């Protein structure tokens, strides 16, 4: 059950960026599981990728090719093509070569992406057989269909759009994402595609998606597992009649940055809201850190704790588990007497122990809500970080126990 996640909003077409969807039947006959995306000539493309050492074959190829001329992005679901060694790389190359042959571009202009079961050979022939139908389906209006086509254990498609005006010209930013389990991106299984019709130099675009992902996709976690296949791509087609953005400054850049960051944040949080088996959307705020890293260490210690996550599922205000997680986060010379912890607006622990004003009824009322904020005040400095996560339910265990059956 997705928490606070409704139907897709209107996804505005991005001039110069087309999407086509078809069925290869990788896991189930008839399922739409191949997505082809076409970038207009002259587009800039940038991306951030998983830091998992066992990164998938398509990640290796996409990282090698992203700074060159990119015309097509090819995504398949149902098979991750990870843990497949040299045969996996050869398979990824073959699918790119087939798409290049069908579209008349160089194979190096095709970036591959895969998501699904790890360790199984990529069904190259099935994917090749579905490419022409996806090419024939290419349209700027296919964002919603593509958002569904990249899903795996997701229960709902995820996407959003932003538009702004500069010098009388409307600029569009639209993005989609997928992911519901194996989520702790570090650039789980997470894929994101964002496109704009602004014209942006590749170096500026790369910094933009790196910074945008760092404050959004890299601040979500469902189960703490970093996927072999994480990718988030940003494409600038340059079709808007505006000057090229060559520096990270100025009104046009700032407007684009805000739109891209907003899209990143919304589709990243949508992944958490649709987390496998999730019944709670949880914001973990850590304030008063001596540096940003210790805020993240504390936040992730709380967000990854199975004891806290199961208490959230049970709506049990077991505040001692939060204190224990903060204490084991590895923050050097942590003075627990300065720490305050809040559930929503309720102070549950102050100066390292139970707050004198706290009652179980107050805590239970907060924990019964679908959206919960855990706020931790460290009292060590001025740094803050925010992480978004879920509870841990019976359904999460069931989904992952039955994933390959």
Swiss-Prot record:
Site feature: Involved in the stabilization of negative charge on the oxyanion by the formation of the oxyanion hole: 115-116
User: Active site: which residues?
Assistant: 189 (nucleophile)
Involved pathway(s): Amino-acid biosynthesis; L-arginine biosynthesis; L-ornithine and N-acetyl-L-glutamate from L-glutamate and N(2)-acetyl-L-ornithine (cyclic): step 1/1; Amino-acid biosynthesis; L-arginine biosynthesis; N(2)-acetyl-L-ornithine from L-glutamate: step 1/4
- Top-level taxonomic group: Bacteria
Is Nucleotidyltransferase set as a keyword in this record? no
Where does the UniProt annotation locate this protein?
Cytoplasm
Keywords attached to this Swiss-Prot or TrEMBL record, sorted alphabetically, are: Acyltransferase, Amino-acid biosynthesis, Arginine biosynthesis, Autocatalytic cleavage, Cytoplasm, Multifunctional enzyme, Transferase
Catalysed reaction per UniProt? N(2)-acetyl-L-ornithine + L-glutamate = N-acetyl-L-glutamate + L-ornithine; L-glutamate + acetyl-CoA = N-acetyl-L-glutamate + CoA + H(+)
What the entry lists under Pfam families is as follows: ArgJ
Entry EC no(s): 2.3.1.35, 2.3.1.1
Residues annotated as binding substrate? 152, 178, 189, 276, 400, 405
Give any single GO term for biological process: L-arginine biosynthetic process
Assigned GO CC terms: cytoplasm
Q: Which HAMAP family does this one have?
A: ArgJ
Listed under subunit, the entry gives: Heterotetramer of two alpha and two beta chains.
Give the PANTHER family listed for this entry. ARGININE BIOSYNTHESIS BIFUNCTIONAL PROTEIN ARGJ (PTHR23100), ARGININE BIOSYNTHESIS BIFUNCTIONAL PROTEIN ARGJ, MITOCHONDRIAL (PTHR23100:SF0)
**Cited function:** Catalyzes two activities which are involved in the cyclic version of arginine biosynthesis: the synthesis of N-acetylglutamate from glutamate and acetyl-CoA as the acetyl donor, and of ornithine by transacetylation between N(2)-acetylornithine and glutamate.
Q: What family is reported?
A: Belongs to the ArgJ family.
Q: What is this protein called?
A: Arginine biosynthesis bifunctional protein ArgJ
């Amino acid at each position: 059950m997705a928490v606070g996640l409704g139907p897709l909003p209107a996804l505005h077409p991005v001039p110069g960026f087309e999407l086509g969807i078809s069925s290869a039947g990788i896991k189930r006959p008839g399922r739409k599981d191949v997505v082809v995306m076409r970038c207009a000539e002259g587009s800039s493309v940038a991306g951030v990728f998983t830091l998992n050492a066992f990164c998938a074959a398509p990640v290796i190829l996409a990282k090698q090719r992203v700074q060159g001329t990119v015309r097509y992005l090819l995504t398949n679901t149902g098979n991750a093509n990870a843990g497949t060694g040299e045969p996996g790389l050869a398979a990824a190359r073959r699918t790119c070569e087939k798409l290049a042959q069908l579209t008349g571009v160089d194979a190096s202009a095709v970036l591959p992406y895969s998501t699904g079961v790890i360790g199984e050979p990529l069904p190259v022939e099935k994917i090749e057989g579905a490419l022409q139908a996806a090419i024939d389906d290419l349209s700027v209006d296919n964002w919603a269909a593509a958002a569904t086509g990249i899903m795996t254990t997701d229960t709902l498609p995820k996407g959003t759009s932003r538009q702004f005006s500069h010098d009388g010209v409307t600029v569009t930013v639209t993005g989609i994402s997928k992911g519901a389990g194996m989520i702790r991106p570090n650039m789980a299984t997470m894929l994101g595609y964002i496109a704009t019709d602004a014209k942006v130099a590749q170096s500026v675009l790369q910094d933009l998606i790196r910074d945008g992902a760092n404050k959004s996709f890299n601040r979500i976690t469902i189960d703490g597992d970093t996927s072999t296949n994480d990718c988030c791509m940003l494409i600038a087609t340059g079709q808007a009649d505006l000057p090229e953005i060559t520096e990270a400054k100025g009104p046009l850049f700032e407007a684009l940055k805000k739109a891209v960051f907003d899209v990143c944040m919304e589709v990243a949080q949508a992944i958490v809201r649709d987390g496998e088996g999730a019944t709670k959307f949880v914001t973990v705020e850590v304030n008063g850190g001596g540096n940003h890293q210790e805020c993240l260490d504390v936040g992730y210690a709380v967000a990854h704790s199975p004891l806290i996550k199961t208490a959230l599922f049970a709506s049990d205000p077991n505040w001692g588990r939060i204190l224990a997680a903060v204490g084991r986060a590895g923050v050097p010379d942590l003075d627990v007497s300065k720490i305050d912890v809040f559930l929503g607006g309720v102070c549950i622990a102050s100066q390292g122990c139970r707050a004198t004003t706290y009652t179980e009824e107050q805590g239970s009322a907060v924990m019964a809500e679908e959206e919960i904020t855990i706020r931790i005040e460290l009292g060590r400095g001025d740094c803050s970080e925010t992480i978004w996560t879920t509870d841990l339910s019976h359904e999460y265990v069931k989904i992952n126990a039955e994933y390959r059956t």
